Amino acid sequence: MNSGILQVFQRELICPICMNYFIDPVTIDCGHSFCRPCFYLNWQDMAVLAQCSKCKKTTRQRNLKTNICLKNMASIARKASLRQFLSSEEQICGTHRETKEMFCEVDKSLLCLLCSNSQEHRNHRHCPTEWAAEERREELLRKMQSLWRKMCENHRNLNMATNRIRCWKDYVSLRIEAIRAEYHKMVAFFHEEEQRHLERLQKEGEDIFQQLNESKARMEHSRELLRGMYEDLRQMCHKAVVELFQSFGDILQRYESLLLQVSEPVNPEFSAGPIIGLMDRLKGFRVYLTLQHARASSHIFLHGDLRSMKVGCDPQHDPNITDKSECFLQWGADFFISGKFYWEFNMGHSWNWAFGVCNNYWKEKRQNDMIDGEVGLFLLGCVKEDTHCSLFTTSPLVMQYVPRPTDTVGLFLDCEGRTVSFVDVDRSSLIYTIPNCSFSPPLWPIICCSHF
């Protein structure tokens, strides 16, 4: 091949960021290609759209696929470059004057074929140098993919911690006021119990606030460690073959050690402090509901994403839903227009449920649809996330940092007061009171639950 054409061909296999042959190349929607690690490291803020470093256009692509054709051609070019390096005078075997085409796994050295069969190396494991180099680069890429997922997870956790810290003091203040309001509704005034409860709540809030700040600092440190290791792995992929072989084991040990140091987020949770007399007061408004028995044919289920809540389920896209899963959404047979009412529902062993009331128009217009948003819904929801569960209320959507109810949840509806209160019956504690509800009577009890 003409040397000029060869140079042009080789130039097309060079990443414009690192100026080395592509490793795991990706092509973004503007048409330019980069090493995946280079593109990721150049993407400074994961919360915003990535920008092409060549044409400066933004790209909406996030799940980038490897350009297999470009990857194979870059591998061929790298192997050709390696063969040229191995045929240099410095790399020729001094004993046999042969090219060092074999790699010894035991002493991490390059050998010619005759040396690899010598008495010294005969019992060692050997493999072709070209294959060993590419195999190690592939292993480094696999580690980088795993590391990138960790970096994304840490980024999400850091954002979540930042949001919690920003809202925490307001959340604590609202919770204190809600607990104080419950004590003041009692016929008998439990002043000392109220003071102890509120003081404990204030102290817990301060302790958790400190834990959140400490956790954020640890995650910020983890972010720098993860990024540094990702950069080191990327650079190792481009090292000369001798250094790649000699340093490979050390960098993998550093990688494994780093994973043990990555900080996990704090899941803040107040203790479930009982309120004396709460259940006695609420049971004075007790009603017993009858649920409509038509189970939704679409296996309606609850998804809780605190950025875009959905009520409903799609068996095709939820790996937790199987043929044996029981998913349903039902309304009460009776509705409420005015007055005060209290009822309970036993959630059993379900970790995925929503329970509350809804405005009439929500029921009439959307009862057979997947529901996006929360207009007209006044719910307490529980969503399982790995081994942890999150509680939240709607209207507006608010995380609730209290223990998950173990069994029975109670709801107190005050139509004139425009409030919906949720209580943990077994612990005799208040979960949350939704204030200033935009009721549009009649109001219907609603329950959405799944059992796996």
Swiss-Prot record:
Pfam families per the UniProt record, alphabetical: SPRY (PF00622), zf-B_box (PF00643), zf-C3HC4_4 (PF15227)
Record-listed Zn(2+) binding positions: 93, 96, 115, 121
GO cellular component, one term: cytoplasm
Domain B30.2/SPRY: 269-452
Keywords for this protein: Metal-binding, Zinc, Zinc-finger
Zinc finger (RING-type): 15-56
A GO term, aspect molecular function: ubiquitin protein ligase activity
Presence of the UniProt keyword Zinc in the record: yes
GO BP term (any one): innate immune response
InterPro entries referenced in this protein's UniProt entry, alphabetically: B30.2/SPRY, B30.2/SPRY_sf, Butyrophylin_SPRY, ConA-like_dom_sf, SPRY_dom, TRIM/RBCC, Znf_B-box, Znf_RING
Family in the record: Belongs to the TRIM/RBCC family.
Protein name: Tripartite motif-containing protein 51G
Organism: Homo sapiens
